[in-house]
Each structure stands twice: as C-alpha cells, then as structure tokens.
C-alpha cells in the first residue's frame, strides 16, 4: 500500500512542533511512507536525510529565478548527495497569492502598509509572526546552510549571515519566492542538473499536462496548492480525470489539494491518480503529538482507506477494482 500514500512536506513545520521536519522524516521512514522535503523548511537537507535514514525521500524545489541558478544547482547537488531520489518542482508559488486569512493573522508581510506611520507599526507587528522573519529562523535553514547562498550574501553585503540573520532570512525568502515564473524551456536546466525523476507540481490543465509529456518529465502533480493561491480556481479533483485520460499512459499522475481522509484517497485513486500527497492532515498530527501523532495520522488514513474499500465491496486498490466504475457523480443521482 505504500505507493498509495506520500506525505507532502508542508514547509514551515517548525512552527507547529520544535522537532519539525526531523520528526516528520523519522515518522515517514518508520511507516514506510515517502517523504517530500520542501525548500522552505527549518532543517537542512542533510539533517533531514539523516533523520529519514533508509526511507524514501524526495526534494521539493521552490525554484529561484534564472539569475540565481548557481543556488539552484547547489541545492540539487546537496539533495542528490543526501539520497533524495526524485525532484518535485513547485510551479504555482513563485509568488504568494492573495491570502486574506494570512494577512489577518500577520502570517505574511503586507508591503503596502509601510506607507503610513500606523502601517509601519502594523508591519512590525506582522513581522513578529511572519515565518520568514521570526528570530528562530523558521523556513530558512536550507538557505542559511547553503554554501553558494552564503558566499553570495557575504559578497553582496560584506558580512556573514550570522551578523544580520534578519537580513539573511529575508533575502532567502526573496530567493525562493522570486516573483518571477519560469518557462517550459527552463525545465531543460533542471534535467541537465538532476539525473533522477522530475515531477512538476501544480498542473491544472490538459494542455499543460500534454506539454509535460512533450518536454520529457516523468510525472506531474495535479494540484491547486490546496486552493490557497487563486481564489475561485478550478478544483484539482475536477481536473484529475481529464488529465489522466490525456496523459495517464505517458507519465505518472499524482494528486493533492484537499485530501483529509481515506475516502478522499479512494476517490482520487478511482479517478486515476497513481499516488496522493498529503500535507495538512499530518501537520495536525505533528502539532498535537509530534512523531507519534504523525504516525497516528498515517495509520488512520490508511485504515479508513481500507475500510472504505471493504464496505464498498472493492477487492483491492488496483485499477482493475478501484476505478471510475465504482463512482457515482452527484449530478447523476437526482
């Protein structure tokens, strides 16, 4: 069953538990679950690899702009050396979407507020919560441990990261959320510098899925980033069967965005997903119970998936049994 479940490493897990990615990586390995490490994490690539041991681990790249390609190469080399076997490339978050709840909670900086004295005061308050500007350096460990980023920071500013950690944190955040998208042609750069499977995350249209086949990547993740980037964007589940029909026999189609229970996994698999990625559910477990809490979430999801199949009279999770024939559209029920 391990091919049916793959936790997506929500970045900034250190906010929810001091052991953060270390606990997540250990729990994933102990439960035979592949682990995906985000670029925006509070633990270095190497430390997570050590915690994950013999587990299967992938690296999720938040892709710097082309002018920072030396930093990208450095991260890829570090990940490969540390035993990460696949590269997951985030396409839909080179800039953060309009997130009212995050702004209400001071979770992201609202730049336009700085134009007034009140705005400046509010900005200082927000920055005390902004994960990339906190004094405990949540989300910036990969950058602060990267030799190329550190060398470029020193060359630019004339001092080491440790001499102004707030400036280093902010610069790393700007590096991995550059505000500049990449082109299809840029994928060739990743293929040149990564010799393992490449999976493009954030595919939401048949046309883009076909383009992924054309450029020769090994997989895609049908994903709208949990619905947090574009308000009113089409749901990933609605697009999944169309994309599977178009390219499912040519590359691996994975799915995320909204998985909360085993029944959700069953639906996605029935619609043709090869694997489901999860994020928020395991964060709940991590926050409440650390490594053991994560293990409980894994077992609960898998247990509910198995019960769902049993009670629906489905013999296995293989496509010969779990497919669209077992689904009924709500529109067809009335």
Where are these regions (language model features)?
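Conserved beta-strand segments that form the floor/walls of ligand-binding pockets within enzyme
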Residues: 6, 199, 221, 254, ...
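Alpha/beta catalytic cores of nucleotide-metabolism and tRNA/nucleoside-modifying enzymes
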Residues: 238-256, 260-334
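Short acidic/polar active-site loop segments enriched in Thr and Asp
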Residues: 34, 85, 218, 274, ...
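Extended hydrophobic/aromatic segments used for targeting, binding, or gating
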Residues: 45-46, 210-213, 217-255
């Amino acid at each position: 069953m391990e091919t049916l479940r793959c936790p997506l490493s929500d970045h900034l897990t250190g906010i929810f538990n001091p052991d953060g990615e270390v606990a997540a990586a250990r729990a994933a390995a102990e439960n035979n679950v592949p682990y995906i490490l985000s670029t925006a994490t509070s633990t270095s690539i190497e430390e997570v690899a050590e915690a994950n041991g013999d587990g299967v681990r992938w690296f999720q790249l938040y892709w710097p702009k082309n002018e920072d390609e030396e930093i990208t190469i450095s991260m890829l080399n570090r990940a490969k050396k540390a035993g990460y076997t696949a590269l997951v490339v985030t396409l839909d978050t080179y800039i953060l979407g309009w997130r009212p709840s995050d702004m209400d909670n001071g979770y992201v900086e609202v730049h336009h507020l700085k134009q007034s004295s009140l705005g400046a005061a509010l900005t200082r308050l927000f920055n005390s919560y902004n994960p990339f500007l906190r004094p405990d350096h949540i989300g910036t460990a990969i950058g602060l441990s990267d030799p190329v980023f550190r060398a470029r920071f020193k060359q630019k500013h004339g001092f080491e990261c440790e001499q102004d950690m707030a400036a280093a944190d902010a610069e790393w955040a700007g590096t991995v959320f550059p505000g500049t998208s990449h082109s299809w042609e840029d994928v060739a750069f990743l293929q040149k510098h990564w010799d393992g499977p490449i999976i493009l995350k954030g595919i939401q249209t048949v046309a883009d899925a076909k383009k992924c086949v054309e450029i020769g990547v090994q997989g895609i993740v049908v994903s709208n980033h949990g619905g947090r980037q574009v308000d009113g964007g089409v749901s990933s589940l609605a697009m999944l069967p169309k994309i599977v029909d178009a390219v499912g026999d040519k590359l691996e189609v994975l799915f995320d965005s909204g998985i909360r229970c085993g029944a959700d996994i069953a639906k996605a698999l029935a619609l043709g997903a090869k694997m489901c990625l999860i994020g928020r559910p395991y964060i709940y477990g991590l926050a409440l119970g650390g490594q053991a809490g994560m293990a409980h979430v894994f077992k609960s999801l898998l247990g509910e998936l198995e019960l769902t199949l049993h009670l629906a009279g489905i013999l296995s999770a293989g496509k010969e049994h779990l497919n669209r024939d077992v689904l009924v559209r709500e529109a067809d029920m009335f």
